[in-house]
Every structure is written in C-alpha cells, then in structure tokens.
C-alpha cells in the first residue's frame, strides 16, 4: 500500500514493510543500559528514520519508505522517575513529538481521558502502568491508538512508536522494459 489515509491503521507501520512484523509481538529487556540506549536512539533516528530508503532494491519499481513524527504521545505510568520515562523523553526530544506524562497516583483516568479528548491529530497513549477498561474506552472513543508495548533500549524498535511510516511506490518500467532513470 502506498500513501496514508486508512491503509495505515493503528501504530502506522505499513503492511509489507520491514517494520511491520515488529508490531505483532512485544519486545522486553532486562536492565536496559540507558547510555547505550540513548546512543542507539540517536543513531537510529539519524541514520534510519530521517532518511528516505528503499529496502526492496528492485530495478522495476521503487518502494520508498519515509517517516514522519506523530502529533503527541501520552504515557500512563506509576513512576515518573523510572528509566523508561527518561528513554521516552529522549525519543520525544529526537522526534519532536510532544510527550505528556500522566502519573497514576496524581491523575485519575477520567482526567487523563478528558485531556486526551482535547487532543487532535495522530495521538497515542502508551500504557506502562495497570489501567482499567474505562481509560482504554476513553482512548478508543477519541480515536487514540493504545500502545501497551514496553519501552526498549533498541532505537529501531522504540522509535517506531513515535512515527508514522509512509510508502511511496513508483513504477520504473513500461510494458516490462526498464526506463532510464535520472
């Protein structure tokens, strides 16, 4: 699929693309090395997510992938000082996506739901703390993607939660004959 619209559902990884399968499971890590994770986030952002690329390498068709930051991420957590929150702040700074932190002990689910309802665009709720169906229903009613994946130290995995992926396809042949490309 090329383009945007409704062909990109949920977290925004295009079907058939190199990042698509990572959304079908959860990656977890024990004892994330924060310094190494931050370095990897920066490396992956600069070398992968800010570059247009064609992983197929076909001569007859270009399938260019490019990435755009989403509009906002809410995170529901129990401990705002947890290392995972520091990594989310790093991802937010790199991608330019605003991060709004909601601490369970400080904000009710209804209050967070009200804040989410006032948001617009491509917004995600990252759930890192136990929650109820009430909050999930509020997010769903607002058209917000709920993301329950744990934060990882892998920039390639983590930064996909902060972007939407666009595929641009271009035919480079005519009746089976390759066209001269500039």
Language-model-derived ranges and their functions:
Residues 1-182:
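C-terminal segments
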């Amino acid at each position: 699929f090329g383009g945007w619209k409704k062909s990109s559902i949920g977290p925004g990884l295009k079907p058939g693309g190199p990042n698509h399968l990572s959304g079908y499971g959860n990656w977890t890590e024990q004892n994330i090395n924060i310094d190494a994770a931050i370095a990897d986030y920066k490396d992956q952002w600069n070398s992968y997510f800010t570059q247009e690329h064609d992983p197929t390498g076909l001569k007859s068709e270009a399938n260019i992938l490019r990435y755009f930051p989403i509009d906002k991420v809410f995170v529901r957590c129990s401990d705002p000082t947890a290392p995972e929150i520091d990594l989310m702040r790093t991802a937010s700074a790199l991608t330019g996506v605003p991060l709004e932190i909601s601490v369970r002990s400080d904000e009710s689910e209804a209050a967070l739901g009200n804040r989410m309802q006032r948001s617009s665009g491509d917004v995600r709720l990252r759930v890192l703390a136990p929650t109820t169906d009430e909050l999930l229903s509020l997010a769903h009613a607002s058209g917000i993607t709920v993301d329950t994946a744990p934060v990882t130290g892998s920039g390639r995995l983590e930064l996909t939660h902060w972007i939407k992926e666009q595929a641009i396809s271009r035919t480079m042949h005519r009746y089976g004959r390759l066209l001269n490309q500039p």
